[in-house]
Amino acid sequence: MYTSRSLFSTLASCLSLATLVASSPTTNQNLPSSKRDATVEQNVFFDINGKEVETRIAKLKAEGYRPTSLNIHGTPTDAKYAGIWIKQDGNPYETIVGANKTTYDAWLDQWKASGYVSTQVSATGPASNAVFAGVMEKIPSIRNWTQICGTSSPYAYLNATGDAPIVITGVSLYGTPTERQYCVLGHEDTDNHQQTVWFPTSSSQDYKTIEPAETTKRFWRPVFIDSSEDKLLASIFDDTSVGNWTVRTDLTASQLQSEITAQKANNMHPIHISGAGSTETQYVVIFTEQATPLERNWHAVGDITGFPDNARVKRDLDEILQKFMKRNSVRQAQVSASINGTVIASRAYTWAESNRAIVEPSDKFLLGSVSKAFTYAAVDHLVSTGVVNLTDHIYPLLGYTKPADPRSLNITIQHLLDHTGGFDRGMSPDIGFIFTTVAQSLNQSTPATLRQLIEYVLAKPLDFEPGTRSVYSNYGTLLLGYLIANKTGETYMSYLEKNVLKGLDVEMYTTPGADHTNDRIVQETKFTSISALTPLSEKRVANVYGGDGAVKEAAVSSFALKASADTVSRFIGKHAAYGLGPRQLFMYRDGTVAGARALAYSMAKLDWAITLNTREYLDENAWNTLVFTDLYQLWGALDSALPL
């Protein structure tokens, strides 16, 4: 799989060309009525030869239709074509069909020299005798693009593009099973577009298992599928919104018309088509409610109340967040500032499609390791009430006296707070994310518990002598969360609510994706892996829903609380952002986990916090610039001007 960023249609057994006019539905749970397509006029063809397709394309071009999908399949001597054209205005375009590689490359170079961009490429046949079809358009906004054909490894494309950010827009599989070839096309990525690309190399990479995994991520969908002659499917998924969608695979020509008719009755448009097979062609089609993805809209809500020039603070803060979110493709965020636990600045930001929630200041975001601040406050309460001492040895306190590494008996509560307990995630796996591994080691089909994880770790050697150096560890706060429950007889969350939160609205972010189907805040990640909830299955889910190896119910004390930025800024007005005790000047805590990024910062007078619904921005430098330069300078200037 390549992770960086469909369309299909088809027609009748007795017809090689048809015109479809589809009206959008009057009701829909996904798209507001104002955002649905009005009337879409399409022209869909399939199972026609080279002479026919040239005639068809010329006629369509003359009538104002534009290509959205073009596919060549079959043998070089008897190539067949399928395509979708839509009637709409647009940039000039050129097409080529049935060209050998020499002719195709010359055509590509000719139109590239005239400022055209390759937008579609398709090939069929063996490597030595392949034939190509393609579309090029004059799109001034695309300044850089890269297309490679004739490679046996699609990952060679990444080497060709180097560090340049690229959105892969098309893939074509051709050649033979023993000498497979790929065409890969990509355009420059100017807005951190999120996608995953699956290049199959064998039948074990079945689209029917890929799609369910990819779509555990809310709003993700297939945008492109290409079929090899032996029916392997290359696919591209992204998180753009087109309302309802569906994919149909393995359709014979005789099944196409009925499928088109059925989908039309549901107001679904075919947007992409691919065929394969030299005898009986089978087709793959993507249907969508919206022919083109929804555009994003900018929203900023909330109040600024605590400064001499509130309007200017609002303007400056909004400019910082708008610039960051648009450049980094971040959809949801909050920023808050408080003094002595009272919120004086609260802004919620949305850069998203109309079928997603507009963020409010009260919405709760996954906090990642900012959750640890609440655990430290809970431990502080345990110490202040005499339940434990910082010098207590953690494992004997929990009833464990025979670890595999005797040095484990020397680990104190203070060591865990200071990240000096002997756990180095640079030497061993990050213990917070090995719940899947623990369950698999026990041949257990149910999720590993925190107790099982602790006992798994106890059977391993430490990475270094406790107390000799500090290395950030999620395991320390897992142990502290277990300690809280073990010594008080309450759940971690119950203890927090009774002794720490004082009415603040903080919750646990649960693991199952089904729990978050209707969440206003979508914690976004493009990555998937084996679910920690079903560790012995092959089921893959979004990392935020257990694909990262974490069971959040067990790891809540380390990185699985959710709250608003307002709540966080108020909390650190009373408690240390980092460390034990009351509020501390110029201390901060940074949190990152799949699907989230957050930061809490105490300055001289101001306490401020930021929450994002993803950590998949351009790079870590983008985050550091946002929080440690732009926001730090803004809040720092305001902080210094506030009265003591």
Swiss-Prot record:
Residues 1-23 form the signal peptide. GO terms for biological process: effector-mediated suppression of host defense response. Its EC number is 3.4.21.-. The active site is at S369. It holds the Pfam family Beta-lactamase. GO terms for molecular function: serine-type endopeptidase activity. Keywords: Disulfide bond, Glycoprotein, Hydrolase, Secreted, Signal, Virulence. InterPro entries: Bact_CellWall_Synth/Modif (IPR050491), Beta-lactam-related (IPR001466), Beta-lactam/transpept-like (IPR012338), PGH-like_rpt (IPR049511). GO terms for cellular component: extracellular region. Its main location: secreted. SUPFAM superfamilies: beta-lactamase/transpeptidase-like. Not inhibited by phenylmethylsulfonyl fluoride (PMSF; serine peptidase class S1 inhibitor), clavulanic acid (beta-lactamase inhibitor) or ampicillin (penicillin-binding protein (PBP) inhibitor). Gene3D superfamilies: DD-peptidase/beta-lactamase superfamily. Glycans are attached at N100, N144, N159, N244, N340, N389, N410, N443, N486. Disulfide bonds join C149-C183. Belongs to the peptidase S12 family. Serine-type endopeptidase that cleaves Gly-Gly bonds in the polyglycine linker of host plant class IV chitinases to disrupt their chitin-binding, and thereby plays a role in lowering the defense responses of the host to the fungus. Degrades Z.mays Endochitinase A (CHIA). Has low proteolytic activity on Z.mays Endochitinase B (CHIB). This is Polyglycine hydrolase. It comes from Cochliobolus carbonum (strain 26-R-13) (Maize leaf spot fungus). The lineage of its organism: Eukaryota, Fungi, Dikarya, Ascomycota, Pezizomycotina.
